[in-house]
């Protein structure tokens, strides 16, 4: 009886079109193998050998078997047929099994494919969602980056605009500075030319001064000879003075005799009554004390002389008795005058005038006088400077001014240089500067080295009175460039 010892089969999960293949072989143990191939599935059958069957290694030949045992051959044929029938049945069964497996595998494959598709769909959806989230995140990041870029771009544009504006301003400033530099260069060239002209002029002046020096040296030598002659005359005059003293003594005796004779009653009756002498005044203080207390023009007499001068007397200011020696108020009188004019005086006592250096010198040299300087600016303010002691030296000392004891509201420091300065005019330069202050600053004054004051300078009207070097100035009240509106210089005895 044939028995199926072992059956193996294998099928791929993926089914293809079926095909049949049958192969017979013998393994190493001598057992027969039958392999059936149906599509992707293969089936192997291992059948045992019967006892009557000999191996192919038997020493006798098959023809001998057939010849010696004919009955065994028929049995073998029958058995083979049975076996083939069994094999055919098994093959059919296997085909059915294969069909069943194929049908089931199709369903399973469809399910597997559906599951795979579902899983893949879920994965794809998850991946898509993740990609969408990542895309949204990236989009947000890109939006933020874009906003930052826009902000940075806007900031850069604003900075660029500011830099452009700054550049334009700098260019304008550079152009203005270039223009200013060009102007300064032109002005510098003009000033250089002017300096060269001044140097030439100064050279000419120095040459002229050298010539004047030579002339002065000649004059000094002449004066030395004159002085020698004068000394001789002085000796002669001294001798004559003794004679004069004797004559004076004789005259005094004669006068005393005449006085004795005039005092006798007989002489008084025989001599007619003389006329009343004319009253004279040396200054306005004497006029005020005489009972004349109205401000106005009065006649004053030089000390020890009959020479007279008209002067304005201020009987109202500070107790009255003031003799006005200078007055400025409207620029109607030109104060750029000569030495002689300042010596004798000029102008009108009712307006602008200068009383005269000679009269003031003689008046103040023998008595102690007070000097008051009254000042008025263009804004309506007034100030004054009061000197407790004032006098002028004689013409031989160039009418040098002497002042002490300053008080008042026009500055704590005197604007008239101290110690005393000599008087200078346009034709008599007695200052301490080689520039001739009277010609440069105009007017006659005690300039010293063109000092801090000049009340006889050029008169400038309102709105033209600032930044004027040659105006009517009083430095320690209004500075050197301010020209005053009105000034008055007046004197009065210190014991008034």
Curated annotation (Swiss-Prot):
PROSITE patterns: FIBRINOGEN_C_1, FIBRINOGEN_C_2. Keywords: Angiogenesis, Calcium, Coiled coil, Developmental protein, Differentiation, Disulfide bond, Glycoprotein, Metal-binding, Secreted, Signal. Residues 159-256 form a coiled coil. Glycans are attached at residues 89, 119, 133, 151, 240, 304. Ca(2+) binds at residues 429, 431, 433, 435. The keyword Glycosyltransferase does not apply. The keyword Secreted applies. GO terms for biological process: angiogenesis; animal organ regeneration; blood coagulation; blood vessel morphogenesis; cellular response to growth factor stimulus; gene expression; germ cell development; glomerulus vasculature development. InterPro entries: FIB_ANG-like (IPR037579), Fibrinogen-like_C (IPR036056), Fibrinogen_a/b/g_C_1 (IPR014716), Fibrinogen_a/b/g_C_dom (IPR002181), Fibrinogen_CS (IPR020837). It is found in: Secreted. Pfam families: ANG-1, Fibrinogen_C. One of its GO terms (cellular component) is extracellular space. Disulfide bonds join 284-313, 433-435, 437-450. One of its GO terms (molecular function) is metal ion binding. Residues 1-18 form the signal peptide. SUPFAM superfamilies: Fibrinogen C-terminal domain-like (SSF56496). Interacts with TEK/TIE2, competing for the same binding site as ANGPT1. Interacts with ITGA5. Interacts with SVEP1/polydom. Interacts with THBD; this interaction significantly inhibits the generation of activated PC and TAFIa/CPB2 by the thrombin/thrombomodulin complex. The Fibrinogen C-terminal domain mediates interaction with the TEK/TIE2 receptor. This is Angiopoietin-2. It comes from Rattus norvegicus (Rat). The gene is Angpt2.
